């Protein structure tokens, strides 16, 4: 491969060949140059339609932007187009990352995060010597570069971001792909480069270059993309560190190198680790390879050593298509982490990025490479992995074009797509280098690669800057400490005056800052109807009131400082009142919007406003006197009225003035009125704010409803656009049918397919309609509720049965417990005998004998109680002993069960061993029989030969060996017979497959020839159509000229000169005209008759072509 790119550079043309005359400027081979006369557009194939919109005023040049939109915009529209207007292309949704996180000053504009497309670069390798010898020097290549970003293969054009022809060098590829990748990584974006193509197309050479170029001490021109990228990366890191040395900028880089061989991951830096597993990090939602070696790198030499080590361990084999064919996908990954610190606020910035350099194994056909054995197995795994990658790219391109998200994207179908899922449609910028071969033998693989690249161009990634900010804990602690000190200082100076009688400077600065913030933040409220400030209840305990204290001292600085403070304060408040008055007169004030937007003239106010919380206010007589207090005194006393605007105006007229001395009672009354007015204003403001929140909630609900409607309209627009496209294709087919190009059978088949597509679209539109979806959701909810009710009904019956069963059990237990609680018969009899005591009257009659009877009864009760206690103890001990026996029996039963299971398992094992031994015994018996038979045969032969004595023992031993060898040979013969049958079956299957492939190849050749013939016929028909259109235009032009001439003659012949001088008619006779006038009239009518006949013949003759054209239009 090195010889291809190095030896052919001198012989390759310096500039690409000019495009053919039928090729468009930038659209590929299918677009024809539009002429000045009107003709119909030729429709492009679907696979080469650029989904990107035409450039707008916001488009800018980017390395990841496809120029196809601009080239298609430059094509002029046709003069006549009888079809429907074309469907507008789908717009790419670009994520503007640069606005959220600006790039450094030195970063170029091309590497910004505003473009989320995929950069696709096609590189055409020079033809090899073998290809030149086989195809001949004069034979043309299959692929040709027609422009800076377009190629053509067999009349079919493709448009990409860049196209590198045979004369391109490694430096050109680096400038196209490598340099933007380095800038993106330094800006914090993840970046990836894929090298895709068939085997032997130059992917490995483009990515790594030859190993000799890596090991050379001098800089070689054949170095690949990877060493050039890291050389620029380390130089840019040094520049950034020198440029931002004040920010303590530090970079850390570590690299890993792996390969995917037969769907198994191997660490190329440590080849002992094989079959590594891919794990997913739940915290960061990213994937990684477990136990993969990562080496820290600091210079380009470290990276070169890793590349040499990894590429030496990579699996490469020789095939007929390539002497060193890569048999695995390899991925070289570099993790870059930068840390910087902002010295102003102490915050730390951490920016991470990742570079993935992927060299995919080349797709190959067994027919061309003649692979067999391990090579065939490797080729099957490679083609399967690339097929899954192509399927994934098709799905991602479909999602990007349609804008509809899919529930499942098959990232896990292969190790390659699972490992690189972040680069495919995720948080990364992707560039793809598609290497193709110009040989005619590889035209199908080249076309497949170009189609793959064109589909990959439609993918949209969401690349964002990976940056985190962490505030310094020490700086935050210092700020908290300073704020606490300021708060403590404000509290101490706010309650006690200074030693010299002047107010605290820190308190004044803090107060002025808060006043500035409150005046510089206007608050706008919505329009409120029927507003009344008297409906809100105000708690007087939560309102701050000015204290009424006597002033016993004045400022020590005298009246000069007091007057200066007064003037500053009066000027600042006067300016604020002017701003408020202007807001009052404006529309915003009429809408009950309150706002204050002004600034104080002097930030260092030295006169405080005395405010004391009502909850901690004490008696003014008991408090200490304060100096130079200020009070809110109205300059004009407001009148009590219910008008809210009047109260607001009265509150605006309030002024802050200084008071040297005690405040009189009239002023206190005025202050109370002012505060009541302020309370009412605040109550109205609070109520308006609540109403504004309610209105905001309503508007948010309306916005959600409008968003749903917008989504519905978007879906309907897409469906309508698809239906319009189908109708346009139908019109085109009808035109081709009328022109005689398309047969009726093909038209009917195409109509059937289009109607099926339209039916699917309408069905999808119906299913995705919001009302239908809501109805479905409601139906599912009702069905679930009905199912729940049914289950509840079934459960109710079951529960009723269980309740009845439990009632029966309870009744049984109660009856049994009552039976158990009955005393034994002996105790009952004893109790009955005891209970048969004499009555009191009998005891009185008995006298002394009654006392003896009572004593005997008591003794019997005591003995009976003792007997019952003993019986109870015996029953308890008996129950405990029985319980222990039950537990022991349970343990014994469990042990017996375990022993029985073990015995059963042992018996099963013994049976299996017995069966195996029996089989072995049978085989040994058969072998022994064969050996004995052989021995008997040998003995018989020896007896016939007359052998006696010791020779017979030797013969017996030989006979045993011969019989053993016979048995082994019989086994081998049977094994090889089975193997032969299997191989014959495989051979027959392979022959059938080859025959089927041959038939398929013949059919494909026939189809290609038919397609080429149809294409030629279509071109001829289109040329004839253009000629017919030109003839139509010429005839129309001639017809217009003839009509103009006739109109001129009509205008000249309507008023002859001799008609004007006719004599007056007589009174008795009829009016007569001279012969000259009548002759002239008849003359121009006779002259006009042939033109009228010609025009009628033109318009009414069915055999004329113009009549058929009008009929076609109708």
UniProtKB/Swiss-Prot annotation:
Coiled coil: 772-810, 999-1043
Region (Disordered) residue spans: 1-119, 1055-1081
Gene3D superfamilies assigned: Kinesin motor domain (3.40.850.10)
Keywords (A to Z) from UniProt: ATP-binding, Coiled coil, Microtubule, Motor protein, Nucleotide-binding
Pfam families recorded: Kinesin
Family the UniProt entry places it in: Belongs to the TRAFAC class myosin-kinesin ATPase superfamily. Kinesin family. KIN-12 subfamily.
GO cellular component: cytoplasm; kinesin complex; microtubule
Residue ranges of domain Kinesin motor in the record: 117-459
Gene behind this protein: KIN12B
Name listed for the protein in its UniProt record: Kinesin-like protein KIN-12B
Binding site for ATP: 197-204
SMART domains the record matches: KISc
InterPro entries: KIF15/KIN-12, Kinesin_motor_CS, Kinesin_motor_dom, Kinesin_motor_dom_sf, P-loop_NTPase
Lineage, uppermost ranks: Eukaryota, Viridiplantae, Streptophyta, Embryophyta, Tracheophyta
GO biological process: microtubule-based movement
Compositional bias annotation for Low complexity: 98-107
Provenance organism: Oryza sativa subsp. japonica (Rice)
Residue spans of biased composition, Polar residues class: 1055-1065
GO MF terms held by the record: ATP binding; ATP hydrolysis activity; microtubule binding; plus-end-directed microtubule motor activity
């Amino acid at each position: 491969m090195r010889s291809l790119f190095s030896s052919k550079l001198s012989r390759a043309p310096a500039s690409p060949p000019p495009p053919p005359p039928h090729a468009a400027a930038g659209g590929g081979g299918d677009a024809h140059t539009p002429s000045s006369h009107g003709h119909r557009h030729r429709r492009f194939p679907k696979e080469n339609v650029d989904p990107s919109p035409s450039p707008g005023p916001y488009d800018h040049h980017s390395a990841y932007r496809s120029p196809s939109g601009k080239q298609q915009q430059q094509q002029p529209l046709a003069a006549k187009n009888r079809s429907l207007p074309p469907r507008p292309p789908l717009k790419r949704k670009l994520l503007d990352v640069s606005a959220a996180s600006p790039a450094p000053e030195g970063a170029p504009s091309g590497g910004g995060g505003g473009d989320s497309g995929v950069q696709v670069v096609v590189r055409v390798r020079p033809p090899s010597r073998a290809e030149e010898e086989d195809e001949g020097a004069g034979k043309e290549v299959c692929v040709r570069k027609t422009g800076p970003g377009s190629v053509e293969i067999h009349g079919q054009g493709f448009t990409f971001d860049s196209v590198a022809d045979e004369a391109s060098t490694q430096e050109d590829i680096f400038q196209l792909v490598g340099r933007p990748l380095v800038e993106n990584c330094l800006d914090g974006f993840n970046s990836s480069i894929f090298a895709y193509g068939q085997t032997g197309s130059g992917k490995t050479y483009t990515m790594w270059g030859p190993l000799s170029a890596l090991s050379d001490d001098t800089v070689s021109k054949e170095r690949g993309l990877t060493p050039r990228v890291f050389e620029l990366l380390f130089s840019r890191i040094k520049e950034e560190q020198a440029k931002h040395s004040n920010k303590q900028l530090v970079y850390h880089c570590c690299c890993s190198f792996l390969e995917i061989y037969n769907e198994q991951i191997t660490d190329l830096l440590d080849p002992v680790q094989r079959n590594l597993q891919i794990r997913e990090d739940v915290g960061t939602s990213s994937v990684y390879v477990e136990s993969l070696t990562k080496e820290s790198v600091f210079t380009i030499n470290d990276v070169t050593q890793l590349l040499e080590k990894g590429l030496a361990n990579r699996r490469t084999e020789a095939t007929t298509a390539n002497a060193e064919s890569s048999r695995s996908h390899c991925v070289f990954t570099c993790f870059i982490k930068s840390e910087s610190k902002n010295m102003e606020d102490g915050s730390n910035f951490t920016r991470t990025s990742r570079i993935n350099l992927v060299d995919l194994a080349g797709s190959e056909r067994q027919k061309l490479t003649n692979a067999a054995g391990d090579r065939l197995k490797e080729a099957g795994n490679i083609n399967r992995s690339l097929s899954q990658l192509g399927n994934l790219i098709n799905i991602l391109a479909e999602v990007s074009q349609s804008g509809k998200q899919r529930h499942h994207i098959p990232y896990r179908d292969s190790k390659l797509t699972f490992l690189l899922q972040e680069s495919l449609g995720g948080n990364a910028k992707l560039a793809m280098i598609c290497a193709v071969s110009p040989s005619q033998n590889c035209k199908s693989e080249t076309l497949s690669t170009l189609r793959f690249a064109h589909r990959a161009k439609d993918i949209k990634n969401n690349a964002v800057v990976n940056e985190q900010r962490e505030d310094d804990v020490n700086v935050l602690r210092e700020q908290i400490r300073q704020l606490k000190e300021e708060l403590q200082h404000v509290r101490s100076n706010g309650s006690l005056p200074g030693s010299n009688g002047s107010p605290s400077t820190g308190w004044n600065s803090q107060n002025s800052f808060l006043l500035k913030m409150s005046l510089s933040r206007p608050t706008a409220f919505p329009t409120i109807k029927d507003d009344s400030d008297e409906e809100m209840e105000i708690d007087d305990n939560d309102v701050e009131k000015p204290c009424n204290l006597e002033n016993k001292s004045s400022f020590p600085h005298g009246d000069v400082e007091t007057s200066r403070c007064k003037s500053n304060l009066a000027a600042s408040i006067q300016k604020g009142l002017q701003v408020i008055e202007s807001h009052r007169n404006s529309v915003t004030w009429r809408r009950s919007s309150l706002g204050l937007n002004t600034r104080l003239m002097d930030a260092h106010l030295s006169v405080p406003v005395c405010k004391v919380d009502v909850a901690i206010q004490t008696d003014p007589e008991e408090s200490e006197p304060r100096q130079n207090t200020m009070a809110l005194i109205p300059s004009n006393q407001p009148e009590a009225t219910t008008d809210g605007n009047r109260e607001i105006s009265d509150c605006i007229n309030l002024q802050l003035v200084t008071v040297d001395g005690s405040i009189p009672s009239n002023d206190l009354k005025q202050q109370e009125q002012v505060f009541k007015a302020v309370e009412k204003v605040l109550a109205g403001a609070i109520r308006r704010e609540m109403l504004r929140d309610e209105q905001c909630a309503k508007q948010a609900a309306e916005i959600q409803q409008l968003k749903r409607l917008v989504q519905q309209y978007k879906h309907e627009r897409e469906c309508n656009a698809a239906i319009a496209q189908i109708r346009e294709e139908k019109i085109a087919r009808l035109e081709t049918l009328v022109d005689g190009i398309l047969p009726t059978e093909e038209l009917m088949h195409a109509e059937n397919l289009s109607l099926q597509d339209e039916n699917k679209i309408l069905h999808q539109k119906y299913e995705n309609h919001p009302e239908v979806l809501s109805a479905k959701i409601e139906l599912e909810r009702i069905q679930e509720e009905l199912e729940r009710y049914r289950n509840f009904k079934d459960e109710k019956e079951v529960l009723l049965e269980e309740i009845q069963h439990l009632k029966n059990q309870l009744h049984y237990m109660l009856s049994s417990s009552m039976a158990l609680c009955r005393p034994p018969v002996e105790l009952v009899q004893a109790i009955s005998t005891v209970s048969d005591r004499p009555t009191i009257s009998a005891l009185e009659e008995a006298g002394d004998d009654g006392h003896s009877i009572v004593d005997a009864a008591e003794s019997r009760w005591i003995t009976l109680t003792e007997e019952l206690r003993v019986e109870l103890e015996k029953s308890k001990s008996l129950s405990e002993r029985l319980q222990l026996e039950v537990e022991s029996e349970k343990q014994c039963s469990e042990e017996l069960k375990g022993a029985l299971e073990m015995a059963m398992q042992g018996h099963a094992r013994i049976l299996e061993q017995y069966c195996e031994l029996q089989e072995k015994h049978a085989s040994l018996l058969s072998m022994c029989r064969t050996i004995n038979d052989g021995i008997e045969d040998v003995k018989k032969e020896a007896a016939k030969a007359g052998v006696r004595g010791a020779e017979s023992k030797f013969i017996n031993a030989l006979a045993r060996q011969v019989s053993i060898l016979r048995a082994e040979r019989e086994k081998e013969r049977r094994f090889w017979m089975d193997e032969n049958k299997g191989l014959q079956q495989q051979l027959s299957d392979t022959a059938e497959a080859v025959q089927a492939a041959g038939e398929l190849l013949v059919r494909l050749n026939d189809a290609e020839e038919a397609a080429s013939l149809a294409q030629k016929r279509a071109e001829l028909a289109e040329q004839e159509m253009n000629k017919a259109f030109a003839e139509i235009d010429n005839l129309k032009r001639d017809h217009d000229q003839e009509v103009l001439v006739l109109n001129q003659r009509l205008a000249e012949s309507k008023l002859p000169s001799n008609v004007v001088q006719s004599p007056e008619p007589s009174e008795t006779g009829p009016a007569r005209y001279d012969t000259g006038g009548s002759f002239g009239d008849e003359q121009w009518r006779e002259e006009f008759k042939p033109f009228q006949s010609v025009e009628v013949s033109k318009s009414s003759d069915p055999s004329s072509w113009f009549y058929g054209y009008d009929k076609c239009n109708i």
